[in-house]
Amino acid sequence: LLINGGFMFLSALLSYIYKDGITGDLIISGTIVSITGLLMLFLNKNHDKQINKREGYLVVVLGWVIMIFSGTIPYLLTGTIEGFSNIFFETTSGYTATGATIINDVEILPEGILFWRSITHWLGGMGMIVFAIAILPLLGIGGMQLFSAESPGPSTDKLHPRITDTAKRLWLIYVSYTVIETIFLQFAGMSFFDAINHSMSNIASGGFSTKNASLGHWNSNPMIQYIVII
């Protein structure tokens, strides 16, 4: 929830820069989600921080469900998508990096919502559990059980002995590739806003775009398509 809330505030910043009229709604969204996350953290601070494998599976399932439901709040408060079922579908599609959408005209959406939409792709692409493994030790909570629940295969004691460091390196690579692609797309002719959104979507192997025609909007510029393919 704290991760979601932080990125909602980042979306609010983009909204303020582009003056799309929904900055306040995004700030409220981030505040609600962040306070809820802090409250849950406070209520559980005295509980046993070591979790077994069964609890690890439960945390993985509930983690995804909570992330998706909290991710619907910006859509609900801004009123950019009608109907909770449509909002839930769009949010789930984002976090699962599916790329399916119920929005007929994405170009009329405010920049803050388009950015939040791409953020859900980006977070879901690497996997929130991998991100959690990287930061849970900072809170004094073990992450190996989450890794066991999220990743089928050999037992974790046969894998990298420092799984937290591995998760951090994965995210460093993920962020680096996103930044590099954003820069390349800008050099190829995209605006910064379009470049960062398409980079997050592409790195996550998703399909969300800021244009109705997606990359077809830049058919006259094959360099953009080459960058995305590479």
Model-derived regions: residue spans:
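Membrane-proximal intracellular helices of multi-pass ion channels
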Residues: 1-230
